[in-house]
């Protein structure tokens, strides 16, 4: 039977979602071990969005196949019991069709990048936001972001380690919400290149700091090279919010 779980986690202390050969500190491995501890079955867990080290999730989605049949609330509670000392929580579990795949069945992924824009240290949010000390012009950031909407070659906004064969992606929505000194960059698309959201966030911050002409974003896009865009924002400000199916 195939089960789908929705997962929330604090990514600060993990090596990322995906299992790694020389590390036992991935989120995937922690959940697989928790499932084994209550079911006795060695399962393979597949996720909807592979987050890097330090990245958080409010609504990661994963699936696994298990022979043992359990009531859904028991699956959720049993996994959480075996994760109780770890900042990973299963929010809910459901049975899905065998054709469902957490990665390949996804129709849209939603990310949010969180910034605190003030000079005084963000004592209560360290590790959960990127603190930018210089004042940001959010209106310029919004105007620059509009040029990223739609279908583009996003080679300027992917890491040098990105292995995607095709750099063309379609950004469905990008919105920048300001509440006092908190700035959230919200972005959604069916798929993303490696580090795409973090590089976009870093680039938009540079626009906001330097009061750069928003039209300059078109030049960055046209260059199709990583060096044209801004810095890669730190991982701890990034959240995988949810995935639509």
Curated annotation (Swiss-Prot):
InterPro entries: PsdUridine_synth_cat_dom_sf, PsdUridine_synth_TruA, PsdUridine_synth_TruA_a/b_dom, PsdUridine_synth_TruA_C, TruA/RsuA/RluB/E/F_N. It is an enzyme of class 5 (isomerase). SUPFAM superfamilies: Pseudouridine synthase. It comes from the Bacteria. Substrate binds at residue 111. The active site is at 52 (nucleophile). The keyword Isomerase applies. One of its GO terms (molecular function) is tRNA pseudouridine(38-40) synthase activity. Its EC number is 5.4.99.12. CDD domains: PseudoU_synth_EcTruA (cd02570). Transmembrane segments: none annotated. The keyword Transcription does not apply. It catalyses: uridine(38/39/40) in tRNA = pseudouridine(38/39/40) in tRNA. GO terms for biological process: tRNA pseudouridine synthesis. Keywords: Isomerase, tRNA processing. HAMAP family: TruA. Homodimer. Formation of pseudouridine at positions 38, 39 and 40 in the anticodon stem and loop of transfer RNAs. Belongs to the tRNA pseudouridine synthase TruA family. This is tRNA pseudouridine synthase A.
């Amino acid at each position: 039977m195939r089960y789908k779980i929705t997962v929330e986690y604090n990514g600060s202390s993990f090596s990322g979602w995906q299992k790694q050969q020389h590390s036992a500190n991935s989120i995937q491995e922690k959940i697989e071990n928790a499932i084994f501890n209550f079911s006795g079955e060695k399962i393979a867990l597949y996720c909807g969005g592979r987050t890097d080290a330090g990245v958080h999730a409010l609504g990661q989605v994963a699936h696994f196949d298990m022979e043992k049949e359990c009531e859904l609330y028991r699956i959720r509670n049993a996994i959480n019991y075996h994760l109780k000392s770890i900042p990973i929580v299963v929010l809910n579990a459901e049975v899905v069709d065998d054709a469902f795949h957490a990665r390949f069945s996804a129709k849209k992924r939603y990310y949010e990048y969180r910034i605190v824009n003030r000079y005084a240290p963000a004592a209560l949010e360290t590790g959960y936001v990127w603190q930018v000390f210089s004042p940001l012009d959010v209106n310029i950031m919004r105007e620059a972001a509009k040029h990223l909407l739609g279908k583009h070659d996003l080679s300027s906004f992917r890491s040098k380690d990105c292995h995607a064969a095709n750099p063309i992606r379609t950004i469905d929505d990008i919105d920048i919400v300001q509440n006092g000194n908190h700035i959230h960059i919200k972005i959604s698309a069916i798929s993303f290149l490696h580090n795409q959201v973090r590089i976009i966030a870093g680039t938009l911050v540079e626009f906001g700091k330097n009061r750069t002409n928003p039209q300059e974003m078109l030049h960055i896009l046209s260059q199709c090279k990583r060096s044209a865009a801004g810095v890669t924002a730190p991982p701890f400000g990034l959240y995988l919010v949810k995935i639509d199916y």
